[in-house]
Amino acid sequence: MLRAVGLSDEDFEKPLIGIANTWTDSTPCNVHLRDLASAVRRGVIDAGGTPLEFNTIAVSDGITMGTSGMRTSLVSREIIADSIELMGLGYHFDGVIALSGCDKTIPGTVMALARLDRPSLMLYGGSIQPGTHAGRDITIQDVFEAVGACAAGRIDEEELLEIEKAACPGAGACGGQFTANTMATVFEAVGISPMGSGTVPATDLAKAEVARGCGRLVVDLVERNVTARQILTREALENGVAVAVATGGSTNAVLHLLAVAHEAGVRLTLDDFDRISAATPLLADMKPWGRFVAPDLHRAGGVALVARRLLEGGYLKGDMLTVTGQTLSGEVSDAEETAGQEVVRSAADPIKDRGGLMVLRGNLAPDGCVLKVAGHERMFHQGPARVFESEEDAMTAVQGGTIVPGDVVVIRGEGPRGGPGMREMLAVTAALAGSGLGSKVALLTDGRFSGATHGLMAGHVAPEAVEGGPIAALQDGDIVTFDLEERTVSVDMSPDEIKSRVMAWSPPSSLIPDGALSKYARLVSSAANGAVTI
């Protein structure tokens, strides 16, 4: 049958390379991947391989944000991994190269590569360029925050529309150190993506040559018989954690690296993230909390510069193998720094002495919750709970002006099982920021956050409410305390009272249609374990 698609006897003698594409024209993050796949194909042929391309799904977080469609986002990560794994097993590919763009396509593809354990690599499609409004660079983050600003009367609808029209000027993933760029930088540091390949922006003319080089490289991996799990070791994944926290990356990095570790047969826990973040300095001044976007990082020197700085400080393990055949130290030894760049600081002069993520525990999160600390200085917050059973209810309260300084916004029933799908709460967190409340309130949820979220916002609360987690015990007015020095989040309530309230709580009735979401709800594990399906 392969003759019928154009292959010859000569092609059958060559390594068969699967090109796993996540192209779609329904999001700018992936709209250009068809062209990149063509360049990859040329590279595979250059190196003496036979390419076979196939496609899988891509659900855009940005487009589904704040809607019921966001329930499908994290679910899509598992389906991406499953579908690539099945194609790899079914076609017996000798090697696989996966092309990714929007948030879940990046970890989903790498999870599949870990399962298959074939010679393989992941190529990220690159970041979008920033838009421009009123003489300043803007990103999709500005749009979501402008919604809150408009609701609060700080801008009018005409300016909101202008910001929305300007924020996304072309192909590529959201431009700050949000989830997509976080995971792309992480996987360069881990070694499953070639160093320097991901930060090249989507619309840069050099991207096609990067893709062609990756096509040649995957054939070389086959010839060297270097498989994914030889690269995805515990030490390499710890390097990825260090780069995530040193760049102020997304809390989603926790979910996704735990999931990749699971698929690679590596033990990685929330405690590892907390330990590494506490010991690793924050070096990169990146949005959503900082000044710069991914193309700025690329011009400054890229992930190689970040990794070199961390290696110089003793924060990375330099002898880890990468897909190029070099060690991490070898990859970054000649990293070039653009004179005068202000994006990446030295380890001796960091932005902060500790990295950008923190794990909190306590009687509201016995199995942990995750907080991004890169963008704020508050180490303590105590205030009354404002409890909501869904993101929509919380959004109504924010837009209605009923959330006041000091409040702790609690959104539950949004975990992996409870959602189902563990929606991102960016609509709410951005509305709080846009209305001027971002630095005056705190938020606690068993859902998760966009990489564009910043402020005292703790998510991934485990156990989640529908699993009997103590977050289900909270009622309006309960005093919730965040103590970041002690790494705790708690409520002043006895264990017996918490247990009694949890037993009395029942989630709001929601009809989950038979299909992917109900299947996911039955199979998904805790956020503390990466929300993988088992």
What feature does the model see in each segment?
Residues 1-25, 29-31, 36-57, 62-63, ...:
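Catalytic or ion-coupling anion/metal-binding cores of large enzyme and transporter domains
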Residues 44, 83-87:
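Glycine-rich, N-terminal phosphate-binding loop and its surrounding beta-alpha-beta segment
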Residues 87-109, 121-124:
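A short, small-residue-rich loop immediately preceding and capping a beta-strand
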Residues 73-82:
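Glycine-rich, highly charged phosphate/nucleotide-binding loops
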